[in-house]
Structure formats: C-alpha cells, structure tokens
C-alpha cells in the first residue's frame, strides 16, 4: 500500500512528532548537554523514522539520501576537524541498499525476515562506532519493510523496534558510561515510558487514516529539516564551546 500523496495522514502525524523529538534531542546534544530529559525525549525519533523508512521503501535506494548524507558528513568533518560517526542519512541509505538486495529473502517467509533483523542487531556491536546507531538502523528498517508486506505482523514489528531501542539506551548507560546516553535509573524509566507511548501511538490507528491538520510540509521534508538543523546547531556548538574560527 502506498500512502496517498496529497492527503495528510496518521503516518504524517507520527513522523511530525518524531521531528519535534529529534529537534529537542539535537538542541540538547549541542546546546544543553546537562538537560538529559531532552536526550530522553529524542530517543523516540530514531525508531519512528527508521521504521517508516523501511515501511515506505518499495523501489530502489534513493540517491539523494546518500548525497545529502555525504555532504553533511564532509561539513561535520571539516567543522570538527576530525572524522566522527557518520550521520543517520548514511545509515538509512545502507538500510535501503540492504533491503533492496535481500528483499525477496526478507519477505519470502515470515521467519526469514526476522533472521535478517537478528543478524543486524548482533552486528550492531561492531558497527556503532562507524555509523550512527550502527546496524540497528537497518534492523528497524527491515521490521518496517516486513510490516508493510505482512500487515498481521505490524504490532509485533513495532514492538521489536521499540524494544530494541530501549535495550540500546540501557546498554549504553550500563556498559559504556562515557556515551551520549549516560542516563540515570530515573532517566531510563522515563525513556521506557516515552518509548512505550510511542509504541502505543504506532499501533493505535491505520497509517493511511486522514487527519485534518496539514503537516505534510513537516513530515515529508524530514531530510531537509534534519540537514538544516544539524548544520546550524553544529556551527553554534563550535562557535560557542571551542576557539571558534580564529585559528583556521
């Protein structure tokens, strides 16, 4: 099923909420790192975006995603004068490539798709330092792709996507204390609460259900919103917290 192009729907609402969460997360990361609540709210963005990146994938990998991802990565590398973990656009493009080449295997039998998910979750451990969220992005995209082709498994796919996101945050907190997700026990409870609400919202209504508020201009321009806010916030971060551009 391809979502109607000219009508705002429930999927647009979910993605708009994810955009808001993403914006709060990025502001917290670059400007207010002491406010962990902003990072906690931001944890709902990745599973929603990646799930729908897989759910809506039906053709070939989108070249514009990797182009914007590479340009943004070059900008970040020049700005920080070092190579950092690649941005999530590159992760999503790799996910599209993976689904494209393994699409028949993923959808040929119910358990095949979940085997692919399991492999990607396992590979996360050796990939998270290279690409944003590691292969967890690909795993959640596969879940979205399965949900599109196996509607009866949508709730299960959403549950696994949210559950792995909870485990991801908890793992970083417990085992990698210097990570961006160094949450307290209270923070982890809040994280669990927000992600549980996200799961409920993801299974609450049909994604194609029409809504009255026109928010397509937000939900269908996520790539541009992401790139613009990263460019601006990283620039402010460098200018505010380092020597700025005096030594360039």
UniProtKB/Swiss-Prot annotation:
UniProt membrane topology term: Multi-pass membrane protein
Pfam families in the record: TraX
Entry's localization field: Cell membrane
Residue intervals passing through the bilayer: 65-85, 105-125, 126-146, 156-176, 188-208, 222-242
A GO term from the CC aspect: plasma membrane
UniProt keyword terms in alphabetical order: Cell membrane, Membrane, Transmembrane, Transmembrane helix
Protein name: Uncharacterized protein RP591
Annotated organism of origin: Rickettsia prowazekii (strain Madrid E)
